Amino acid sequence: MIVMDYHLIELCRAGDSSAIEHFVQTYQQDVYRLALSILDDSSEADDAAQESLLAALRALDSFHGASSLKTWLFSITVNICRTRLQTQKRRERLRQILGGILQVTRTPSAEESTIENESGQAIWRAIHGMDEKHRIPIVLRYYHDLSVAEIASILQIPEGTVHSRLNTARRQLHEVLKEGRS
């Protein structure tokens, strides 16, 4: 673990408000981007990011430095996002049952609009069309530049499984993009 991270963690554990503020400022953007890339909803991502940072601060005593602080925090974020996705699926089922009465249209945020307008628009849509088990490793690897070892740690799966899921996801992307050009 980096000495600066260790010092920051110790200050946060002691309740130092400036250290807590520094922790949040340091990791908030990365956590938000990860949540947005998983949830594809800026409001949900903002809530998930706040929840992740708060959960991490509350659980600092359980952080032992086996992985980097960022990897540990990303693990918390992925778990919170998974819970939110399950909740979204339940809500969606309820909406379908109620015949769309509860459906609400949302306006994309500026960041979402930028992502949608970039040249990778087709790739982004294809990634979000994947199931969670393949989407999350792709997002962590290519949008957050994490190593296979870090992804394995976050998802609590063997590195070989990460490699396999990445390969499967790349094949799926290739097929979807190939069909889109036809």
Locate each region found by the language model.
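Structural recognition of an alpha-helix C-terminal capping motif at a helix-to-coil junction
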Residues: R33, D47-L54, S67-N79
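Short, charged helix-capping/linker segments at alpha-helix termini
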Residues: R13-H22, Y32-E51, E159, R181-S182
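Arg/Lys-rich amphipathic alpha helix in sigma70-family domain 2
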Residues: D61-H64, S75-Q96, E116, T168
